[in-house]
Regions:
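P-loop NTPase motor core of the ASCE superfamily
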Residues: 68, 75-77, 81, 86-148
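Conserved P-loop NTPase motor cores
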Residues: 2-103
């Protein structure tokens, strides 16, 4: 594990990665305004074979590469948003997963730090796209909750 305090903006850095996970934490504005980071999500991650997670407080914040990043994400981890509940609703409406999200969120958000995981990967069948308790953190429930 390595911590890098700033966003690496060198193509050589991204091309040298393989079989690893990169987490871009709280650098959405900088990442979403970088053509290189847009290419990281669009090209490098698939060709060089590494995974990228990016965190954002506001999913729909506009920037030159924000839609490129959103369109190339396979997984979305949604937490209960007290300040703006419309954000999660807008996300699931765009993904056509409103029914599943309603069920999953009522289960997940009844627990501390509850979340809903949405997977858009073609490797996962659509009925298993929405789940909670993925990491079995609920000691009374050691199985993943899927919502169809």
């Amino acid at each position: 594990m390595e911590y890098i305090p700033d966003l690496p903006l060198s193509p050589e850095f991204w091309q040298s990665l393989k079989d690893c996970l990169v987490v871009i934490d709280d650098l959405w504005k900088m990442a979403a305004n970088s053509t290189l980071i847009g290419n990281v999500f669009k090209v490098y991650a698939r060709k060089v074979k590494f995974s990228v997670y990016i965190t954002s407080q506001f999913f729909f914040e506009k920037a030159s590469e924000s839609s490129v990043i959103r369109n190339n994400c396979d997984h979305f981890l949604l937490f209960e948003n007290y300040s703006n509940q419309k954000i999660n609703k807008s996300i699931v409406e765009r993904l056509d997963l409103v029914k599943q999200y309603k069920e999953a969120s009522s289960y997940a958000y009844s627990k501390p730090y509850g979340y809903v995981l949405i997977t858009l990967s073609r490797k996962v069948a659509r009925p298993f796209a929405v789940c909670s308790n993925f990491f079995c953190e609920d000691p009374n429930n050691n199985f993943i909750q899927f919502f169809q």
